[in-house]
Each structure stands twice: as structure tokens, then as C-alpha cells.
Amino acid sequence: MNRLAVELPGLSLKNPIMPASGCFGFGREYAKFYDLSVLGAMMIKATTLEARFGNPTPRVAETPSGMLNAIGLQNPGVDYVLAEELPWLAQYDVPIIANVAGSTVEEYVEVAKRISKAPNVHALELNISCPNVKKGGIAFGTVPEVAAELTRAVKEVSDVPVYVKLSPNVTNIVAMAKAIEQAGADGLTMINTLVGMRIDVKTGKPILANGTGGLSGPAIKPIAIRMIYEVSQAVSLPIIGMGGIQSAEDVIEFFYAGASAVAIGTANFIDPYVCPNIIAELPALLDELGFDHISECTGRSWNNGQTVYCGA
């Protein structure tokens, strides 16, 4: 028995560990360190309809126990991803989760329709933290009705299951999750980064050219745990948890909160081997904790040992 295998909508994972979108590119740099086939899945960089250069520099700043980024969705566009990146990734035995971004519902729909047809794309991850240019620039992920509308539109055209990446920059993340569930999403990924800022004490100006950026890393882990704990009890969708994971113990904590798999982001910048190392360490930790299978850990903090999510 593979004690780490996880079944989710569209995803048969050999283990529940995957790199988070935006921290792993399309895997080319990390493939120099290890065989990407060891990963449970891989979330590729956000893809838009046209190529995007991203925000001006500086767009990364270190913070205590984390980092700020304002990359601005730099990517080569869906045509290039389909022609170059996904065919290159096909050499690895790893299911791909394609992160889809856009400025309008129509852009999301077009990207989703095209990228979901790629043979090694097993699921989509909707990045709903993008600003909606037709709604005054407000992020798709901050208004439940807007997020639900986007989810429904993408579900209608996608050939694969759709996971929605929840933004923590909301007053009621449970209401957001419920609206997305009712709109037909197949799963949730959470949490995205929190909006933050650093100011240079010598100049008195924000360090990031964009002013604000997304805070990630261990600093946001307690927030991610709390939000997953709340959402997992309110909806029936499987959750891929993320936010500051850097050890096997962190993975178990996310599972206890209610996650069924996890994604690792910022830690890849610190240690490129973090994903395979955690995969290797998990069986011994399960032994220590007295579990036969990783799925037994899901929702352990609130479910009295009952199965929370099992199977696709």
C-alpha cells in the first residue's frame, strides 16, 4: 500500500506534495536538482491569454519569516505554454495543475478552454486574486458573487476539474468558499498571499515599485491553518492547502486543519530539495504519529477521527 497516495477530482497523486504556482516556474530550473516525477503533482506558473512582462522592479522584498512579491503575473502567454512548456513537462510522470489568470471573465474562459485540452493538464487552478478590469479593478476573489460567476463560466468550458484558489484578503472566507462550491467548483486551493508592504527607512518610500505585494512564507502559516480549519467544516470540497509549509510536520498540521493535499511555495527558494525531502520524511512521521495512511490525518483537529474526504 502506498501510504501517501491521494485521490482528488481529476488527480491521482502518488503523494500529496506539490510545488505551488509561482514559486516553481514551469519546473525547468528545479529539474536540474531532482527528477520531477517524484512530485505528487505540479502547479505551473499562472498563465494569461497574452504574454505579460510583469511589474517594474524591484518586485521582491524579504520580510521576517517570509517575503513580499509583486511579480505581476509575468508569463509567456497560453500559446507558448501549450507549444513549449507543457510538451517539455510531458517527459515527467507528474499530473499538471494549470494556474489560469486574467483581467476579464472572457480571458479566463479562453485560457481555460485551451489549456485544459493539453493531455498532461489534469486540473485547473483559478487565480481569482486578479483585478477585474470591467468591475473597477476589484479582485475577482473578494466578492462572492463575482467569484461564483467566474467559476461557473470556466466550468462550462473546461475539460478537466476546476479548483479555485482562495484569497485571504477577505472579511469572510467561508462565505467565499460556499459561493464557489455552489457555482460548481471541484475543489479549493488556499491560501493565496496576503497584501503587505515594506518601506525603506532611508528613502521613506515603499521598497516594491508596485507599492504593495503578496506576503508569503512561514509568517502566514497560522492564518492559512485557521482559514482551512474554518472552510473545511463549511464545505464538502477537497482542499489543497498552502501557506508557509517548510517541513513534514507542517504538512500534517495542514492535514489536521482539513487539507487533503498541500502545495509548497516560498520554501523552494530557500531549499530546492524541500519537496522531495518532505515526501521522504512523511512515512516515518506517520509511523511516529500512529497513522497507516496520510488521509487519516485530514480534519483530525475537528472531525473526531471520521473520514472527511475520500476519493474523487
Curated annotation (Swiss-Prot):
GO terms for cellular component: cytoplasm. Binds 1 FMN per subunit. One of its GO terms (biological process) is 'de novo' pyrimidine nucleobase biosynthetic process. Pfam families: DHO_dh. Catalyzes the conversion of dihydroorotate to orotate with NAD(+) as electron acceptor. It is an enzyme of class 1 (oxidoreductase). Substrate binds at K45, N69, A70, I71, G72, L73, N127, N192, T193. Its EC number is 1.3.1.14. It catalyses: (S)-dihydroorotate + NAD(+) = orotate + NADH + H(+). Its cofactor is FMN. One of its GO terms (molecular function) is dihydroorotate dehydrogenase (NAD+) activity. This is Dihydroorotate dehydrogenase B (NAD(+)), catalytic subunit. It is found in: Cytoplasm. Pathway: Pyrimidine metabolism; UMP biosynthesis via de novo pathway; orotate from (S)-dihydroorotate (NAD(+) route): step 1/1.
